[in-house]
């Protein structure tokens, strides 16, 4: 009898594979008792990172995540991202992901000071998609506790969450256009 082995895909917490191959990430908000849509991603790792960021934001250090906390990583042993000139000189595509640690942008003025204190989220970045070094002018995807205080550029969405605790160094993860084929087209198209 021939044994058949099926190559099983790695399954991440909070991530579902869509029939057309993209990966959806969502998390359950325990206070509102609703599911919060985090977006669709090209790879399961990007979706898992989005889930991990939301889980840490909602549940703090006791959150069950797919990957270890970036704050627990030894930052001295992380490889640095090569410059565009170095990548062009090597003519080799990079097949791994790189995390960038950056501070959130300044908070716009608002009359409701309770909701404007914290914005944080992940932005996934794949080195072969990068043409230049990380710039703080690029608009990442943020969580905010009030949609009135959030600003985003086209291609990025803002998701609201209640603030649990502050994070000393937010993790940003770059991703492509935030167009979800499950939703109607955005008004700016």
Curated annotation (Swiss-Prot):
It is found in: Nucleus. One of its GO terms (cellular component) is nucleus. Pfam families: AP2. Keywords: DNA-binding, Ethylene signaling pathway, Nucleus, Plant defense, Repressor, Transcription, Transcription regulation. The keyword Nucleotide-binding does not apply. PROSITE patterns: AP2_ERF. Residues 11-68 bind DNA. Residues 83-117 are annotated as: Disordered. A motif (EAR-like (transcriptional repression)) lies at residues 179-185. Contains a slightly degenerated ERF-associated amphiphilic repression (EAR) motif, which may be involved in the activity of transcriptional repression. Belongs to the AP2/ERF transcription factor family. ERF subfamily. This is Ethylene-responsive transcription factor 12. The lineage of its organism: Eukaryota, Viridiplantae, Streptophyta, Embryophyta, Tracheophyta. The gene is ERF12.
